[in-house]
């Protein structure tokens, strides 16, 4: 048995001993995904954090995801195995900046992408993910919407509403790098393959896609599509799930440079050590958590 398998067995034993739940994002390393109780997108993981039984949640993702789990499951211990796994986009808007934006646009609703800090969620009216951004925006009674922090997701949602969407100027370092040239090269290499991209991509890339969806939406599309070849425009970690769950389908990365270094920081050693030590533990101050919980709860209630 190799070192990876030994570590995985040790983690599974510790998980049972500690009554822990292991959640992993679709962008995590394959060997981490393989031992998770659930691998999914941000919306699926948020719902799981709120509903799953257990004393401890080990969140294999980045910091804002673990914060969201701590907000939704205040009675559980939430661990983030790689303490330095952050999301640069989440740092592109602060609570203070959002308060100023509200003052500049009185009467506008604030929709925050889940890729934000707890403090920003606390200043927002409702949260969204890439899977439900359109329905969240359309659920609001206000006719103007401040959308933070991802400009690309905000502009994508604006295509499907009559509301005036005011997007922030944030972006995902991975998805914003895709260009129309990347699409052209991939289609030349794989003629006939459907192009499926994440809504965090630039508008000019989205315009060239056959389908646009969240990570789990991409998986469902590949599973149900009659086609057999797909060009996947999101972080390459999703290819592991696609290879396991879509037998007979061939999936190619839109760019092999689409790697989120922060999502890859979590290793099996980190997971094992977190279960042994009960650290690093993620907590959110009650005053912020209660306000952020309202914004997340409104999303989950849709």
Curated annotation (Swiss-Prot):
<dbReference type="GO" id="GO:0046872">
    <property type="term" value="F:metal ion binding"/>
</dbReference>
<keyword id="KW-0808">Transferase</keyword>
<dbReference type="GO" id="GO:0051539">
    <property type="term" value="F:4 iron, 4 sulfur cluster binding"/>
</dbReference>
<feature type="binding site">
    <location>
        <position position="172"/>
    </location>
    <ligand>
        <name>[4Fe-4S] cluster</name>
    </ligand>
</feature>
<keyword id="KW-0408">Iron</keyword>
<dbReference type="GO" id="GO:0008987">
    <property type="term" value="F:quinolinate synthetase A activity"/>
</dbReference>
<feature type="binding site">
    <location>
        <position position="42"/>
    </location>
    <ligand>
        <name>iminosuccinate</name>
    </ligand>
</feature>
<comment type="function">
    <text>Catalyzes the condensation of iminoaspartate with dihydroxyacetone phosphate to form quinolinate.</text>
</comment>
<comment type="pathway">
    <text>Cofactor biosynthesis; NAD(+) biosynthesis; quinolinate from iminoaspartate: step 1/1.</text>
</comment>
<dbReference type="InterPro" id="IPR003473">
    <property type="entry name" value="NadA"/>
</dbReference>
<keyword id="KW-0963">Cytoplasm</keyword>
<feature type="binding site">
    <location>
        <position position="87"/>
    </location>
    <ligand>
        <name>[4Fe-4S] cluster</name>
    </ligand>
</feature>
<feature type="binding site">
    <location>
        <begin position="198"/>
        <end position="200"/>
    </location>
    <ligand>
        <name>iminosuccinate</name>
    </ligand>
</feature>
<dbReference type="GO" id="GO:0034628">
    <property type="term" value="P:'de novo' NAD biosynthetic process from L-aspartate"/>
</dbReference>
<feature type="binding site">
    <location>
        <position position="130"/>
    </location>
    <ligand>
        <name>iminosuccinate</name>
    </ligand>
</feature>
<comment type="similarity">
    <text>Belongs to the quinolinate synthase family. Type 2 subfamily.</text>
</comment>
<feature type="binding site">
    <location>
        <begin position="113"/>
        <end position="115"/>
    </location>
    <ligand>
        <name>iminosuccinate</name>
    </ligand>
</feature>
<keyword id="KW-0662">Pyridine nucleotide biosynthesis</keyword>
<feature type="binding site">
    <location>
        <position position="260"/>
    </location>
    <ligand>
        <name>[4Fe-4S] cluster</name>
    </ligand>
</feature>
<feature type="binding site">
    <location>
        <position position="25"/>
    </location>
    <ligand>
        <name>iminosuccinate</name>
    </ligand>
</feature>
<dbReference type="InterPro" id="IPR023066">
    <property type="entry name" value="Quinolinate_synth_type2"/>
</dbReference>
<keyword id="KW-0411">Iron-sulfur</keyword>
<keyword id="KW-0004">4Fe-4S</keyword>
<keyword id="KW-0479">Metal-binding</keyword>
<feature type="binding site">
    <location>
        <position position="215"/>
    </location>
    <ligand>
        <name>iminosuccinate</name>
    </ligand>
</feature>
<protein>
    <recommendedName>
        <fullName>Quinolinate synthase</fullName>
        <ecNumber>2.5.1.72</ecNumber>
    </recommendedName>
</protein>
<dbReference type="Pfam" id="PF02445">
    <property type="entry name" value="NadA"/>
</dbReference>
<dbReference type="GO" id="GO:0005737">
    <property type="term" value="C:cytoplasm"/>
</dbReference>
<dbReference type="InterPro" id="IPR036094">
    <property type="entry name" value="NadA_sf"/>
</dbReference>
